[in-house]
Structures are given as C-alpha cells and as structure tokens.
Amino acid sequence: MRLIIQPDYQSVSQWAAHYVAAKIKAANPTPEKPFVLGCPTGSSPLGMYKALIDLNKKGIVSFQNVVTFNMDEYVGLPKEHPESYYSFMWNNFFSHIDIKKENTNILNGNAPDLDAECARYEEKIKSYGGIDLFMGGIGPDGHIAFNEPGSSLTSRTRQKTLTTDTIIANSRFFDNDINKVPKTALTVGVGTVLSAKEVMIIVNGHNKARALYHAVEGSITQMWTISALQMHEKGIIVCDDAATEELKVGTYRYFKDIEAGHLDPESLIK
C-alpha cells in the first residue's frame, strides 16, 4: 500500500486528479479499449473532480474514451432528485468534461428488480475487462461505498441497509432531516472494489483519522472495510495531515520519506 500525505485538502485533490489524469494518458485509451474508471460521490472527491475538470478544459486529459462506473446509488430516490448520485455526478463532474453519456454507468435505485440490477452491473463491469482504477472515499467508520461495518470483504454489488451513523452523516444533504435520507442503497461490494486493477482512496479531515489508522496500521477486519485495501497489490491512500493524527509517528515519517519524490502533482503527468 502507498500512503501519499499532503498538507491539506486542496493538495490532496490536486495530487489525486493529476494521478488519475496520468493513468488515463498512459493507457492511451481508444473506443475499442477504453479506460475504465470507478467513481465515488460525497464531499471527499469534490476537489479532485474540480481539478480534473480544469485539466480537461486545459486539454491535458480527455475523457472521450473513458467509461465510468459509480460506486453506489440510493434506493427509491428519483434520479432527478438533487441528492441522487446521478444528479451529483452530472452536476459536479460529467456535465463539465468531454465524456460521452453512454459511457457513464450508475446503478438504478428505482429498478423493478434490484437484485437483477446489481447482477447486471457486475456483468457490465466484467464485459469491459474490469475496472482499471477505482477511486473512492471513506466514512468516519471506514466504510467504502455503502459497505458498512460488518460487510463481507468478498462482497459484490448488492442492496444494503444504511447504518444510523451513515444516515445521520448524510442528513446534511437532506436539510439535516434524517427522515428524508433513504434507508437503503445499491452499492458495489468490497470485493468489487478490490477486483479493480488499482484502487485510490481519498481520506481527509480529523474525523477520518481513526479510519485511516485502521486502514494503515490496523488488522484486516470487516468492521473497518477500508482495511481490506491492505490486500490489494496496487492500493493508494491520498490523505491530508489532519487525517494522520492517529498514526504512529514512525509510520508517518516512513511514508513521508519513501514518497518524498512523488508528492508534487505536476511531476505525475509526463
């Protein structure tokens, strides 16, 4: 696992965006062999998306031959609802870049058969040869996508009941009214994420410090699903200083030392 420690959220976002752009450019994708990108929602990736939009507008990276698969979607929320993840992606990312609409994939939380929708999603990912780079964020309890504590580390795309903590955390997007927050969601599984060729997770803020500790120094456990990233041969966590507050000093210094030559985002794009 790589741990890229940046001073603040803006630096995290810039590094993550340049890393994604570099991976897309290096793959030299074509319509026949597109680059397949896994996309998260929430507050963590917003800065990265803004930076990617800027790189796209400057002509540094193109998304014309990129196919995306989103991590999750609420069940029962109309896709046009301002807080659906469909709306989130189009408002904050897709509508600002040169991606083709038919190349974007988001789970349908209003499908008549939700189990069939999840199975279809997994099969479509496989049809592209898997995901090249899965981006993500985590919750304060270490959950990836909506894989709450206790989720199987080999799980695939399925319907999940949200924990009270997640509902409370997400209520900030629903007028701070927990009764407006959907109680279930469709989500890729931990196994789905780990099947990607590469995984990059953004962790920022003091409230994620305990989760980062479990991700880097803790044992692998279903109670902190982010800890499963330790098993991935190409896992990267990009974090800010505030998120490292529960790491051992030795761990912090180790990663700062070995990644010292890779912290400048501009150096990532050749």
Swiss-Prot record:
It is an enzyme of class 3 (hydrolase). It catalyses: alpha-D-glucosamine 6-phosphate + H2O = beta-D-fructose 6-phosphate + NH4(+). This is Glucosamine-6-phosphate deaminase. Pathway: Amino-sugar metabolism; N-acetylneuraminate degradation; D-fructose 6-phosphate from N-acetylneuraminate: step 5/5. GO terms for biological process: carbohydrate metabolic process; glucosamine catabolic process; N-acetylglucosamine catabolic process; N-acetylneuraminate catabolic process. It comes from the Bacteria. The keyword Hydrolase applies. GO terms for molecular function: glucosamine-6-phosphate deaminase activity; identical protein binding. Keywords: Allosteric enzyme, Carbohydrate metabolism, Hydrolase. GO terms for cellular component: cytoplasm. The gene is nagB. Its EC number is 3.5.99.6. PANTHER family: GLUCOSAMINE-6-PHOSPHATE ISOMERASE. The record marks S151, R158, K160, T161, Y254 as: Part of the allosteric site. Catalyzes the reversible isomerization-deamination of glucosamine 6-phosphate (GlcN6P) to form fructose 6-phosphate (Fru6P) and ammonium ion.
